[in-house]
């Protein structure tokens, strides 16, 4: 089991009720209600280099036309683990009742499996019981979240999400010893990465998938519904991620909520921008949902595509590295301006520790002398106002969608939207 960060107070996320048409009767099923998907996702294509899942359950890329959403070859709502018909989203991905129950039993029982072969067994509907080790490995590979499983075995009620990474707690505040780590992006020198940066790299959430449905009707409403569902799942992951940041869990529970409610969209928007860095004039909302500016407009996002691309181009010009991204993301969290924060000094202490970690990383990257690290850190920090401005536009747009009442939204997403617009 993962070790606990000192001071963690659990946040509770209530699961959505089960879909009335969910498949029943599997010998492996349990009765825990699934977190259901909002209806009508939009067609889209995958990120370059994204491999299709075996058994045809991954999203294939189609031919891209100018400003159009491109249909994926994904069959309607299949389980990403075994390819059976999915009953909804369970623990972060589309999955069937059997794989949902298997994953739940494995986590609750802390069961360890071993593969009798070479850890490369094919997992299909017919063969999913043949190798439990490879089945569980595939559950994790497609993105099932361990923190989505209640560990008390009590059915129903409120669902407790613990932090994902199984890492030792990092003391806060304190010194951040440096160690060498190769910097991504070419033949640059190695940069010393302090313990905080290393920790942030470890706790960075795994990929989420939008799972757009190519059988959904034309129009922008299905696409907006897909994004609302994606954002709802990302909020759950963001809460878990924030809890793993040293210093955040030492805040009072009310201050944790105030911080999250004020900056969650900035964290999500920065994630979209980071996924889009390898692309040219396209936005990667998820691994399997990539739109250009015209495609975003066709999907009902109005001018948001242009606003998001402006942020992406700013970060592309800076050649943002992954270490810098995880620091910038944590700084965006700590950069809350909520008037409801009770202990502003504690939040400021967290912000200063992250700022120092950024300066230390840039100092190792730039080498001694010249103050280049401070200039680089300053340029990165100057992207935060644009990030906040862009997130504000996204919030305003989806709050307008909420007021129209034409697109179903999950309870958590609604609550976070309303908290921001109050």
Swiss-Prot record:
| Sequence segments annotated as region (AF-2 domain) | 402-422
Covalent link Glycyl lysine isopeptide (Lys-Gly) (interchain with G-Cter in SUMO), residues? 14, 402
Map out region (Disordered) in residue numbers.
1-66
Q: In which tissues is it expressed?
A: Most highly expressed in kidney, heart, and brown adipocytes. Also found in uterus, cervix and vagina.
DNA-binding region per UniProt: 76-151
Q: Where is this site: Required for DNA-dependent dimerization?
A: 124
The alphabetized list of GO BP terms reads:
negative regulation of transcription by RNA polymerase II; positive regulation of transcription by RNA polymerase II; regulation of DNA-templated transcription
Q: Does the keyword NAD apply?
A: no
Q: Name one GO cellular component term.
A: fibrillar center
Q: Name one Pfam family in it.
A: Hormone_recep
| Alphabetic keyword roster | Acetylation, Cytoplasm, DNA-binding, Isopeptide bond, Metal-binding, Nucleus, Phosphoprotein, Receptor, Transcription, Transcription regulation, Ubl conjugation, Zinc, Zinc-finger
Residue numbers carrying N6-acetyllysine: 129, 138, 160, 162
Q: Name one GO molecular function term.
A: DNA-binding transcription repressor activity, RNA polymerase II-specific
Location of the NR LBD domain: 192-420
Residues with the modification Phosphoserine, per the entry, are 19, 22
In residue numbers, the region (Repressor domain) covers 1-76
User: Where exactly is the Glycyl lysine isopeptide (Lys-Gly) (interchain with G-Cter in SUMO2) cross-link placed along the chain?
Assistant: 189, 402
CDD domains (UniProt xref): NR_DBD_ERR, NR_LBD_ERR
The answer, when asked if Membrane is one of the entry's keywords, is: no
The consequence of inactivating this gene is: No visible phenotype; mice are viable, fertile and display no gross anatomical alterations, with the exception of reduced body weight and peripheral fat deposits. Mice are resistant to a high-fat diet-induced obesity. Cardiomyocyte-specific double konckout for ESRRA and ESRRG are slower at gaining weight, smaller and shorter from 5 to 7 days of age compared to controls. They show decreased absolute weight of most internal organs except the heart. They have about 70% decreased plasma IGF1 levels but normal plasma growth hormone levels.
Modified how: Phosphorylation on Ser-19 enhances sumoylation on Lys-14 increasing repression of transcriptional activity.
Please give the subunit comment from the record.
Binds DNA as a monomer or a homodimer. Interacts (via the AF2 domain) with coactivator PPARGC1A (via the L3 motif); the interaction greatly enhances transcriptional activity of genes involved in energy metabolism. Interacts with PIAS4; the interaction enhances sumoylation. Interacts with MAPK15; promotes re-localization of ESRRA to the cytoplasm through a XPO1-dependent mechanism then inhibits ESRRA transcriptional activity.
Function, as annotated: Binds to an ERR-alpha response element (ERRE) containing a single consensus half-site, 5'-TNAAGGTCA-3'. Can bind to the medium-chain acyl coenzyme A dehydrogenase (MCAD) response element NRRE-1 and may act as an important regulator of MCAD promoter. Binds to the C1 region of the lactoferrin gene promoter. Requires dimerization and the coactivator, PGC-1A, for full activity. The ERRalpha/PGC1alpha complex is a regulator of energy metabolism. Induces the expression of PERM1 in the skeletal muscle.
To which protein family does this belong? Belongs to the nuclear hormone receptor family. NR3 subfamily.
Name the record gives this protein = Steroid hormone receptor ERR1
Give the source lineage, highest ranks first: Eukaryota, Metazoa, Chordata, Craniata, Vertebrata
The gene that this protein is the product of is Esrra
